[in-house]
Amino acid sequence: MKLAYWMYAGPAHIGTLRVASSFRNVHAIMHAPLGDDYFNVMRSMLERERDFTPVTASVVDRHVLARGSRDKVVSNISRKGEEQRPDLIVLTPTCTSSILQEDLQNFVDRASLYSESDVILADVNHYRVNELQASDKTLEQIVRYYLDRARKEGIFNRSLTDVPSANIIGILTLGFHNQHDCRELKRLLGELGVSINQIIPEGEFLNNLKDLPRAWFNIVPYREIGLMAASFLEKEYGMPYISTTPIGISNTADFVMQVEKLMNFWATVLLGKKFHYDQYVENQTKFVSQAAWFSKSIDCQNLAGKEAVVFGDATHAASITKILSGEMGIRVSCSGTYCKHDAGWFNEQVQGLCDEVIITEDHTEVGDTIARIEPSAIFGTQMERHIGKRIDIPCGVISSPVHIQNFPLGYRPFMGYEGTNQISDLIYNSFNLGMEDHLLDVFGGHDTKGISTKSLSTGGKSIDWTPEAESELKRIPGFVRGKVKKNTEVFARQNNILKITVDVMYAAKERRSIESLA
């Protein structure tokens, strides 16, 4: 176990609660001490929903430690069953309460005798999996539970829908632009002639899960959640699924072609016709998406030779790397993800598209990599935005974890052809425009930022700048000022210099010139 003040993926119980609170009329009981019950506040703040978060904390306090938890947990489950009348109550411990090693399945079995609601214990190992893995497992557990029961009760309908249809698996609360992506995905599928059978877990009733196998195929937009449920449906009911994420021109085209392939598997038999989407892809790429022609414009060509670092969850980091390298001609110096459990897939996706790959959950390692590379822009999470501010490198946020700024009220999808426009804007606006900085530096204006003397590393001694050195640094054009400042501070640390003067600046410049000629 490692102590950290920042985690890219939260603890396992957060993943379970995200899934439970995404379904309609499902309540979650969290067996946890005070301090682990922040999910309600976090979801209420970020999602800005009118409804209360359907999560209750069964608090582990000194009385519980003295007498045991069973009576309290069973009482809370029964009480919530009477008050809320949910279809399902999900009981989950947290990492902290798991230390007590209580038989929570026994609590669930006992509570089921008194509650009219279904009661299950989240089948998650809280010591071995993180938020993303737990959400994937919990969704699969709920889908399996209700499909198995429907089959036993004889209310199971396996017949396919009359028109082509798909299930979208993995849209849930607190996801990165999930609601916007879902709207865009529904629009894209509608234009392809595919109706939506079900979207799970977001906004779906559990009673409808028995109709999941009626769809022609499943779609898993994000690898982080939905793959286990889709694999279960494929294994048990022969339902194929698409796991290609339609982010970017090339990925969206691949996605549409996979939809065509799965549609025609049944369409020739049930409808007596075939679907062809080649012309649709061409029209969307040329006339609907602005990203294709923008990537050939002089504005985008100005980004040629710029370096970028990408870091985030596996789905978004891989997709953005493909867009930067393959579609916009930007050099990706480093691409990485914190999804260590999906490292194999990620390496395969970004192979040949970046100079190096980093797979880590340690934000300090990511920060040191960024400081070493000194890219023109960063594309990452909320933490990479903090890192960028400290070393004066702009950052575009492309992945969870994020704060409230990245739960926009306006329509901001990342998926589909409209998503390509949004991503192109994000990428272009994330880079500092050299001439703009230079003109502001010459003529003045709103750019009144002081010179930051903070270093990324918190372990070394701080380096001070003399007023004369700061004045000299301000005379350097803005688009290279950050790099000059960084190189000077590196030179000072290497030579144990704690105060940077004008002479030190020129000495650092001379050293840099010699190294570049060597």
Curated annotation (Swiss-Prot):
Residues binding [4Fe-4S] cluster: 36
Catalytic activity entry: chlorophyllide a + oxidized 2[4Fe-4S]-[ferredoxin] + 2 ADP + 2 phosphate = protochlorophyllide a + reduced 2[4Fe-4S]-[ferredoxin] + 2 ATP + 2 H2O
Self-association and partners: Protochlorophyllide reductase is composed of three subunits; ChlL, ChlN and ChlB. Forms a heterotetramer of two ChlB and two ChlN subunits.
Active-site feature positions: 299
PANTHER family with a match to the protein in the record: LIGHT-INDEPENDENT PROTOCHLOROPHYLLIDE REDUCTASE SUBUNIT B (PTHR33712:SF7)
Record-linked InterPro entries: ChlB/BchB/BchZ (IPR050152), LI-POR_suB-like_C (IPR013580), Nase/OxRdtase_comp1 (IPR000510), P-CP_red_C (IPR042298), Protochl_reductB (IPR005969), Protochlorophyllide_Rdtase (IPR016209)
Enzyme Commission code: 1.3.7.7
Cofactor names: [4Fe-4S] cluster
Protein name: Light-independent protochlorophyllide reductase subunit B
Native species: Adiantum capillus-veneris
UniProt record similarity statement: Belongs to the ChlB/BchB/BchZ family.
Pathway: Porphyrin-containing compound metabolism; chlorophyll biosynthesis (light-independent)
Superkingdom classification of source: Eukaryota
GO biological process per UniProt: light-independent chlorophyll biosynthetic process; photosynthesis, dark reaction
Protein role: Component of the dark-operative protochlorophyllide reductase (DPOR) that uses Mg-ATP and reduced ferredoxin to reduce ring D of protochlorophyllide (Pchlide) to form chlorophyllide a (Chlide). This reaction is light-independent. The NB-protein (ChlN-ChlB) is the catalytic component of the complex.
Transmembrane segments: none
Keyword list, A-Z: 4Fe-4S, ATP-binding, Chlorophyll biosynthesis, Chloroplast, Iron, Iron-sulfur, Metal-binding, Nucleotide-binding, Oxidoreductase, Photosynthesis, Plastid
A GO term from the CC aspect: chloroplast
Localisation: Plastid, Chloroplast
Annotated binding of substrate, by residue: 434-435
Cofactor binding remark: Binds 1 [4Fe-4S] cluster per heterodimer. The cluster is bound at the heterodimer interface by residues from both subunits.
Gene Ontology MF terms in the entry: 4 iron, 4 sulfur cluster binding; ATP binding; metal ion binding; oxidoreductase activity, acting on iron-sulfur proteins as donors; oxidoreductase activity, acting on the CH-CH group of donors, iron-sulfur protein as acceptor
